[in-house]
């Protein structure tokens, strides 16, 4: 229970400035609700800005425009198959029905939110009932970060940046790995060289995938004049005498600010990627940080939610991805590298333990399961 004295009032308070938080804010604004986003770090974008920027939405408008519309019942069958009973039919149906509407809403909310679909990036299990070799991953086009103006410096960027002018769309990356095999791979190489030339001649600062997605979402927020407070961590959720959440305490400019949220607080502050004590509690097999996620992700929102009675699930899960760690500590995704011919992956006993081209979640699950047997699988070795 808290005393009802507030320094600031809004209808909806969104905690976190990644893709989920910004989407929630745009929707609240569309419902004529006074909305505020608060972000713990000095930069916006969260883990979404560091990601591949793909959104799996069968039946999205960009798919329909290309003349391909997966059948909702097939999509439901596929999701039910791959989730193995962990998700209710009601929730699966909601995703199948509402995700395309979400994409349609975003496209209509701002001209910056442009989405494209390219066939051929297959579902992870296209052989299963309802799976598709065409795929349903939706992306955004590249964008010149100069469009952000002064906000460009506030976009969270990856630790390992490509040389100036080098950026990959998802399809570019797949073809680039064929550079020694066919003309399509060589064409991508020529394209990359031309991008470097343009960057140096004209000052372009092009960005793709997650960087482009979050730049576009930030521009959409600006279109709607939705305020975003940076360097403003949420430290506590406030409740009334009945235990209902009525707002939050946010640290701003060195002092606590009590914010009333008349219609609710949206927690979109990410996971606990870099809280090693908490991670070891759920997955002791992982001894080091090794996370690509937002450096500010320490589980603050989850803890605050638990304190007011929120339930949690799947805290032992993550978006797993095998990676290589350079001597200086930088991490590099291992996506196409695992699928190249004439190479294989072995554990500490020198034995293969999985199909190298398996989906990255399956690959990492196999590493964790193998580590529990007492044979080293973390790390494993690419031969």
Language model: regions and residue ranges:
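N-terminal Rossmann-like FAD-binding beta1-loop-alpha1 element of flavoenzymes
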Residues: 12-37
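Short loop/turn motifs at secondary-structure junctions and domain boundaries
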Residues: 39, 240, 334-338
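Glycine-rich loop(s) and the adjacent beta-strand/alpha-helix scaffold that form part
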Residues: 202-211, 223, 252-328, 332
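A conserved short coil-to-beta-strand element within the FAD-binding core of flavoproteins
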Residues: 230-244
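Short, acidic, Ser/Thr-enriched surface-loop or helix-capping motifs
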Residues: 240, 251, 347
């Amino acid at each position: 229970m808290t005393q009802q004295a507030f320094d600031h009032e809004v209808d909806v308070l969104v905690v976190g400035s990644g893709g989920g938080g910004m989407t929630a804010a745009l929707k609240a604004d569309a419902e004529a609700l006074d909305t505020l986003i608060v972000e713990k770090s000095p930069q916006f974008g969260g883990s979404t800005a560091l990601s591949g920027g793909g959104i799996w939405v069968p039946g999205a408008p960009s798919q329909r425009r290309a003349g391909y519309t997966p059948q909702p019942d097939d999509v439901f069958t596929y999701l039910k198959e791959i989730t193995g009973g962990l998700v209710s039919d009601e929730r699966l149906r909601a995703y199948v029905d509402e995700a395309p509407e979400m994409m349609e809403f975003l496209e209509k909310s701002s001209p910056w939110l442009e989405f494209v679909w390219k066939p051929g990036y297959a579902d992870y299990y296209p052989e299963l009932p309802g799976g598709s070799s065409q795929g349903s991953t939706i992306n955004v086009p590249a964008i010149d970060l100069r469009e952000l103006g002064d906000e460009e410096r506030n976009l969270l960027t990856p630790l390992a940046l490509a040389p100036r002018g080098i950026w990959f769309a998802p399809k570019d990356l797949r073809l680039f790995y064929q550079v020694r095999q066919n003309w399509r791979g060589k064409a991508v190489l020529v394209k990359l060289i031309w991008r470097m030339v343009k960057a140096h001649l004209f000052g372009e600062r092009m960005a793709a995938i997650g960087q482009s997605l979050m730049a576009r979402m930030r521009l959409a927020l600006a279109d709607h004049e939705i305020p975003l407070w940076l360097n403003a961590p949420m430290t506590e959720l406030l409740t009334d005498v009945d235990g209902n959440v009525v707002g939050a305490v946010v640290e701003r400019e060195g002092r606590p600010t009590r914010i009333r949220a008349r219609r609710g607080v949206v927690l979109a502050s990410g996971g606990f990627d870099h809280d090693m004590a908490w991670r070891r509690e759920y997955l002791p097999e992982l001894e080091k940080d090794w996370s690509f996620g937002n450096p500010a992700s320490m589980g603050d929102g989850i803890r605050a939610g638990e304190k007011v009675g929120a339930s949690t699930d799947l805290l032992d899960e993550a978006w797993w991805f095998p990676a290589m760690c350079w001597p200086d500590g930088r991490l590099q995704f291992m996506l196409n590298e695992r699928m190249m011919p004439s190479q294989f992956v072995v554990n500490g006993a020198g034995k293969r333990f999985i199909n190298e081209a398996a989906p990255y979640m399956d690959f990492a699950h196999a590493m964790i399961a193998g580590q529990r047997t007492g044979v080293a699988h973390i790390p494993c070795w690419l031969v």
